[in-house]
From Swiss-Prot:
Pfam family, one: Forkhead
Compositional bias segments (type: Polar residues): 1-18
Disulfide pairings: none
DNA-binding region: 94-188
Protein name (record): Forkhead box protein D3-A
Subcellular localization, as worded in the UniProt entry: Nucleus
Result, substituting F297E: Abolishes mesoderm inducing activity and interaction with tle4
Length: 371
């Protein structure tokens, strides 16, 4: 009993021990399971950490490779674009020459040393690509430089040479316009000097047409002057046609006596008055030297002369030799620059002129026999 009891007790204790062991085992098992769970968690966490590390390493690698490839592609595209842009930039560089230099180049390279506007533009376009690509914009500049600079001379086109536009050439005096033959440097602006012969011809033309120029700055004086210009027509032809219809009236309307006194005493110089008096005496001597048998007048004229002499002793008819012919045939007499100067003299009645300058003509006429 004791043994059994002890055995039972031992069994019980053993059972209890076993149960305790079992309990301990169970506890250990639970701990192992917890450890296993912890190890599994740690392994999963480590695996996830490794995967995270691997993923973190792989993720930056993939974009880094694509970025380098993109950068390489971008650089290649930029280089291609720069290469494409560099080609036209090199051809669009504006030449360092002025328009005058370009025109001079084109004229000098031509065989005839003259070109039209179209020929000049064609040479510049073929020589310089910049102007070839911008052709219509600079053509007016070439035209303005041709017309505004004295170094370029316009040559009209010959009648038998068909075409359009005039020729342009260089002035011979503008050869040294550029410094040492370099078209990059121009010494100074060339100005054409007017020749002396052209100036003399212009002055002669102004003197010739000065009498008919109403807008002349020097004005126009009617009458005779001591130092006046002798018209060539007065020396070649004995008779000058009247020009009264071309000129306005120069002498105011006055009585005949006042007109005679003022027109000749004020406008004629003393030397001319002496010459006219000598002409009157010469005319009187010519009339006296003519033969008396020459039939110069009719009966009606003689009767008219006698009546006029009785009414006005100082007025007579015109003698055979007129004052106009004497004035025109006398060479030393200085006339005005045109026929307008003798207009007042021709407008005076002839009987007044003969009465003043030929007082002895009445006696000569009275001696002629009537027929």
């Amino acid at each position: 009993m004791t043994l059994s009891g002890s055995g039972s007790a031992s069994d019980m204790s053993g059972q209890t021990v076993l149960s305790a062991d079992d309990a301990d085992i169970d506890v250990v098992g639970e701990g192992d399971e917890a450890l296993d769970k912890d190890s599994e968690c740690e392994s999963t966490a480590g695996h996830t950490d490794e995967v995270g590390e691997l993923g973190g390493k792989e993720i930056p690698r993939s974009p880094s490779g694509s970025g380098t490839e993109a950068e390489g592609k971008g650089e290649s595209q930029q280089q291609q674009q720069e290469g494409i842009q560099n080609k036209p930039k090199n051809s669009l560089v504006k030449p360092p020459y002025s328009y005058i230099a370009l025109i001079t180049m084109s004229i000098l390279q031509s065989p005839q040393k003259k070109l039209t506007l179209s020929g000049i533009c064609e040479f510049i376009s073929n020589r310089f690509p910049y102007y070839r690509e911008k052709f219509p914009a600079w053509q007016n500049s070439i035209r303005h430089n041709l017309s505004l600079n004295d170094c370029f001379v316009k040559i009209p086109r010959e009648p038998g040479n068909p075409g359009k536009g005039n020729y342009w050439t260089l002035d011979p005096q503008s050869e040294d316009m550029f410094d040492n033959g370099s078209f990059l440097r121009r010494r100074k602006r060339f100005k054409r000097q007017q020749q002396d012969s052209l100036r003399e011809q212009t002055a002669l033309m102004m003197q010739s047409f000065g009498a008919y120029s109403l807008a002349s700055p020097y004005g126009r004086h009617y009458g005779l002057h001591p130092a006046a210009y002798t018209h060539p027509a007065a020396l070649q032809y004995p008779y000058i046609p009247p020009v009264g219809h071309m000129l306005p009236p120069a002498v105011p309307l006055l009585p005949s006596s006042e007109l005679t006194r003022k027109a000749f005493s004020s406008q004629l110089s003393p030397s001319l008055q002496l010459q006219l008096s000598s002409l009157s005496s010469t005319a009187a001597s010519i009339i006296k030297s003519e033969p008396s048998s020459r039939p110069s007048f009719s009966i009606e004229n003689i009767i008219g002369v006698s009546a006029a002499s009785s009414a006005a002793p100082h007025t007579f008819l015109r003698p055979p030799v007129t004052v106009q012919s004497a004035l025109m045939s006398h060479q030393p007499l200085a006339l005005s620059r045109s026929t307008a100067a003798i207009g007042p003299i021709l407008s005076v009645p002839t009987n007044l002129i003969s009465g003043q300058f030929l007082p002895t003509a009445a006696a000569a006429v009275a001696k002629w026999p009537a027929q």
